[in-house]
Amino acid sequence: LHLSFRRQRQMCIRDRFTRYGASVNTRELIAEEGGFIDDSISFNDDLPYFVNVKDKPWLVLPYSMETNDARFWRGGLVSTGDFYEYLKDTFDCLYEEGKTHPKMMSVGLHCRISGRPARSLAVEKFLGYVNNFPNVWIAPRIDIANWWLTNYSGLKQ
């Protein structure tokens, strides 16, 4: 297990863990393992929040399968236009809501799916669209977690 984590650290920005087969013990186990500062074993909110794990605050960055390119494989998306329109509509809704309450949009991308030529154009088009809006931050989840911990640590429960 530790060798696997070391190799993953060499190749990735951050450690990963299962989000799909999580058990009631997963959050405690990743908090104990060390090297993690958050988890995404949650689909219940638009913003990060803190929970208690063994009497310590733990950051949860909620995730969304709605805007994940895996929908090409599992059904729900047929064309790259479908993916772009869904991402754009989701962004537009959250951006409007974000005028009064902050929002976070997760977009799950996989090299083997959105790395394909036609699908990569949808991602490029979406990023171009989003970049035209003020007050939008496109960031990897680790940067969001670090920002949240720095700016909202006083809200830990």
Predicted feature locations:
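Active-site-adjacent pocket scaffolds in enzyme catalytic domains
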Residues: 14-101
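C-terminal domain-boundary segment and adjacent tail
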Residues: 38, 88-157
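Flexible, glycine- and charge-enriched loops at secondary-structure boundaries
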Residues: 2, 77-80, 84, 116, ...
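Single conserved hydrophobic/aromatic residue that forms the stacking wall/gate
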Residues: 1-13
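Short, conserved active-site loop motifs that form the nucleotide-linked donor/cofactor pocket
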Residues: 9, 58, 136
